[in-house]
Amino acid sequence: MASSEQAEQPNQPSSSPGSENVVPREPLIATAVKFLQNSRVRQSPLATRRAFLKKKGLTDEEIDLAFQQSGTASDEPSPVGPATPVVPVQPPHLISQPYSPGGSRWRDYGALAIILAGIAFGFHQLYKKYLLPLILGGREDRKQLERMAASLSELSGSVAQTVTQVQTTLASVQELLRQQQQKVQELAHELAAAKATTSTNWILESQNINELKSEINSLKGLLLNRRQFPPSPSAPKIPSWQIPVKSPSPSSPAAVNHHSSSDISPVSNESPSSSPGKDGHSPEGSTATYRLLGPQEEGEGVVDVKGQVRMEVQGEEEKREDEEGEEDEDDDVSHVDEEDVLGVQREDRRGGDGQINEQVEKLRRPEGASNESERD
């Protein structure tokens, strides 16, 4: 009874909408087929079976299909004994007392094997997709972590080496910078010392130049002072009374022309190169003026003309010797000028009586020489 009640319970929810559905319900039909194939159910009359199936919620079409599929539509119970009142027998539930012929068992075993294979396959896939990655993933993670730790240790070692190298390079660079700074300071000191020495040398050179300039100026002054005074005669002079006097020849045109211009008293014997404006010296002592007497003054006194000429020649020679050290070109010009002056003076002397005033001779000679000439 309990099994029949359990079979009725799952079929009750589907019995209510059974009459309304037009399409046959295959699960109910299959259950009815199994129910009809039961040996005990076959012994029951057909009407009882139909009534029981209708009670379970199957329609007439479904019941007919179930009878056709089960092959029990023509089964009728055979009468064994006398007619006895028919007692309705409650059919047992299919699951509680299944009909187990040989074919159905193998089908059940096959279905069970398929179900077990599906479950095993599901477990295998679950294990492969989820459990195995978790297990292997942990191992891979461990290996990856180990590899990462090894790489980190290598990196830390390389970083430490690079840091030490950088520190050594920085120390060497700092040392080089310090050396360069020392060299720069030394160069700066050397430059300062060189500047100081150059400045002192320049000051000393300027002082030496100033000293040389002062010495040159003093030498110039000495030379100029030397030229301001007439030189003393070195050669002895002939007395005036021993010098023969020649009368001027009337045929010389220079004497005639000079007699006409004998009233000109000053005559300069200096050359243009020895002029006071050119040399930059004072005209005192560097110029020589001569006063020649005309025909009116010839009778006033007798003068030694040759002595005067000798004095003039000596003075010109001394001047020429002084000027030879300075400029050679000026010497040549002075020679020409001196010869011209001497020629002119000789021509002037030819026109007179050969005597010049004694006072002019005293001015051109030193005191000792004038006294000697007077004694003679």
Swiss-Prot record:
Cite the record's Low complexity compositional bias ranges: 244-276
Q: Which PANTHER family match?
A: PEROXISOMAL MEMBRANE PROTEIN PEX14
InterPro entries documented for this protein: PEX14, Pex14_N, WH-like_DNA-bd_sf
Stretches for region Disordered: 1-23, 70-93, 230-376
Instruction: Provide the taxonomic classification.
Output: Eukaryota, Metazoa, Chordata, Craniata, Vertebrata
Going by the entry's taxonomy, the superkingdom of the source organism is recorded as: Eukaryota
Record's subunit section: Interacts with PEX13; forming the PEX13-PEX14 docking complex. Interacts with PEX5 (via WxxxF/Y motifs). Interacts with PEX19. Interacts with tubulin.
Record topological domains on the Peroxisomal side: 2-108
* UniProt membrane topology term: Single-pass membrane protein
Stretches with biased composition (Polar residues): 1-19
Coiled-coil spans are none
Mapped to this chain, the residue ranges on the Cytoplasmic side of the membrane are 127-376
Task: Describe what happens upon changing F35A.
Answer: Abolished interaction with PEX5, leading to impaired peroxisomal import of proteins
Gene name as annotated: Pex14
Name of the protein in question: Peroxisomal membrane protein PEX14
- One annotated GO biological process: microtubule anchoring
| Compartments, record wording | Peroxisome membrane
The record's Pfam families line, in alphabetical order, gives:
Pex14_N
Molecular function (GO) terms listed? Answer: beta-tubulin binding; identical protein binding; microtubule binding; protein transmembrane transporter activity; protein-macromolecule adaptor activity; signaling receptor binding; transcription corepressor activity
Transmembrane helix as UniProt keyword? yes
In the record, N6-acetyllysine modifications are located at K34
Residue intervals passing through the bilayer: 109-126
Phosphoserine-modified residues are S232, S282, S334
Q: Where is the composition biased (Acidic residues)?
A: 319-341
The record's comment on protein family reads:
Belongs to the peroxin-14 family.
Q: Which residues carry this modification: N-acetylalanine?
A: A2
Transmembrane: present as a keyword of the record?
A: yes
Free-text function comment from the UniProt entry: Component of the PEX13-PEX14 docking complex, a translocon channel that specifically mediates the import of peroxisomal cargo proteins bound to PEX5 receptor. The PEX13-PEX14 docking complex forms a large import pore which can be opened to a diameter of about 9 nm. Mechanistically, PEX5 receptor along with cargo proteins associates with the PEX14 subunit of the PEX13-PEX14 docking complex in the cytosol, leading to the insertion of the receptor into the organelle membrane with the concomitant translocation of the cargo into the peroxisome matrix.
